[in-house]
Every structure is written in structure tokens, then in C-alpha cells.
Amino acid sequence: MSVIAGVSGAVGAHKYSQEQIVAHFAKIVSPLGKDAAIIDRIHTATEIKFRNLALPLDAYADLGGFGAANDQFIRIGLDLGASVILAALNQAGLKGEDVDFVMATSVTGLATPSLEARLMPVLGLRPDVKRVPIFGLGCVAGAAGIARVHDYLLGHPDDVAVLLSVELCSLTLQSDDRSMANIVASGLFGDGAAAVVMVGERRAAAMGIHGPRVISSQSRMYPDTEAIMGWDIGGSGFRIVLSASVSEVITQYLASDVTAFLGNHGLKITDIKQWVSHTGGPKVLHAIEESLNLHEGELETSWRSLAESGNLSSASVLHILRDILEGRGVEKPKSGTPGLLLAMGPGFCSELVLLEW
């Protein structure tokens, strides 16, 4: 097993109400006001109250092409990435020189050398640290990242590993895209980063770390779903692909996947005492609640995160994990009880991670 020793999250520096963002977005993508009513209706339906952005609202109209946006992704992503990793290491009682393995994920910008490579001198990482940058997992990458770091630590029980997520979704804005997918996505996504520090079993015992234990994980790809979520990448950057059938796939498959996965560990859905679910959006959260027959309030932390920050892609589920561990608006889980962390993303796919609090 592996142990979660620290979790930290951060959001973009510029906070706006959903109403402010809606009004500004409408001016950019529909300057003549033809789509203003539908933009307002769809963005209001997200149930989001606030979002934090990487840049001031006025900067987006003059951002220019993909190159300029990606430059901002690297600049701001490095600042956010450094802050969350240092905070998570501090929680764990560790320093940069203690880190043996770093996995970094983002689907909202590109960097070569990758972000974690550029952060090495800032964080004080050793030159022999193992690095695994990831692109393409999207919203599922927070859960999948914890699962893959866990896999690594099973084979390296004395090691310290860091998972970094940086998602600056607003920088992918396509001002000429009046598609329903772009209107919906622009009303959902916010900007943020998160880091998780995990340690192997022997390292946890030696340091006396008693955080949540990662017990097991399950990855699942769903047939004939490649076209329902992702990017159409072209000269202008990342153009959103997003189908209304996402919630239908969740309804069709999630309950059987969760039931089988938990059954392999002698558990049932009703045994899970704390759910750590990616936010998605209202339709996604409703689909999860209905398919798993969850009681009102069991995804309260996810709903609150969605309202306060929007969907932060891969960072969302990590922010929710942090909120639960810190008892933000929710009772901290009792030691020894089971929890399930889950997320979905492009593929279309899901990742389930069994925790013991």
C-alpha cells in the first residue's frame, strides 16, 4: 500500500462571479449579442457561483493566438505548481531533496521541458529524481495520477512521490467558436493546481505518517466513446469536444464498475463512508448520485467545490480530497473507514481509487 502524506490546492489569482464571467464571455464570442440569451441560460444552469481565472477578465480579448496563451500557461503554471508542491511537502514534513518520483499532469497547456523539469531548481529536487509528465488524460488525471503513483510506490516502498496537476482552462478560450460545446465548457471550467505527496509503506512507517492509505485502483475504458470528450487541436490551439452523452455513459456503466471493484475487496457501495468525486458539472454529479443510489449530501463536498471554483479538470478531485482531509464544511472521515475517489475523462474512461481513511 501507499500513504497520502500531504495535499495542497490553489486557484487562479483573479476571482469573479459567474455573472461577471458570463457577461464578458458573451462579448468575446458573440459581440453582436446574438447568442447572449443562450449563453446566460446555460452558464446559469451550471450552479457555479464563482470561478478563479489565471488572468484578469480584460486580458482574454487581447490574448492573441495559441502561442501567447501557452506562454501564460507556462508562466502562471510554474508559479501555481511551485506553491502547491511546497505546501504539500510541508504538510508531509518533507523537503524537495526527499522526493524520488514526480508525476505532472495537465491538458490545458504544453511545455517542453515540462513543468516539473523547470521546477526542479525552485523546489530543490535532486538531479536523479524520476519524472513522468502526462498529457491527454484530462479530468480523470487526478484520480489516475494517484493510482499510478500508488503503483510506483508498491515497488518502491521507501520512496517519496509527488503528483502535480496544473489546469488553466481559461487559457484555451476559442473566441471564434460559437458551438454549444464551447458555450457549455466556458461556463464550467476554472483555473487551478493541486499537489499530492505520497510515500511508500516502509517510508510511512519510518516517519510515523498516518494519512489515508491507498488500497487499490481500477481503470476502465468504455467502448465507442472516443468522440464524446477531448480536444480538437489546431492552429488556434485547443478546441473543446464535449458531448451531452457523458452523463449517459456514466449512467450506463458506473454502478456496475463500482459494485464489482468494491466487491473484489469485500465491500458494498453502502460501506463507503466518504466519496471523493470529480465535480464534472451538475449533470455529471446527478448521474453519479443516481447511478450509485447515493443519499442527499454524500457528494456535498463535490457540489460545494463546483459552486465555489467550477470544474478544475484534473485538479478538481484533488481539491475535494484536500477539503475532506481538512474538514472544510464536512466531518473528517473516521480512521479505518473506506472511501472511494473517482473521476472520469477523455477516452471515455473512469478511474476508481479505494482509500482507507
Question: How would you label these PLM feature ranges?
Answer:
Residues L110-L125, L164-S175, E226-W231, L285-L299:
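Acidic-glycine-rich active-site phosphate/pyrophosphate-binding loop
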Residues D40, T46-G136, I269-L285:
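Conserved beta-ketoacyl condensing-enzyme motif
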Residues A82, V107-T108, P121, R126-D128, ...:
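Claisen-condensing/thiolase-fold acyl-transfer catalytic domains that form or cleave C-C bonds
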Residues M1-R75, S175-Q252, S256-A260, M344, ...:
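Condensing-enzyme catalytic core mediating Claisen C-C bond formation in acyl metabolism
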Residues I76-A92, L115, A193, V249-N264, ...:
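Short, well-ordered amphipathic alpha-helical segments that serve as non-catalytic structural scaffolds
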Residues V84-V99, A205-M207, S256-K273, L292, ...:
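Phosphate/pyrophosphate-binding loops at sites that engage ATP/ADP/AMP, CoA/4′-phosphopantetheine
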Residues G6-S8, T105, F135, V160-E167, ...:
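Short beta-strand segments
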Residues K15-Y16, P113-A117, A144-A147, T172-R178, ...:
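Short acidic, glycine/serine/threonine-rich loops at helix termini
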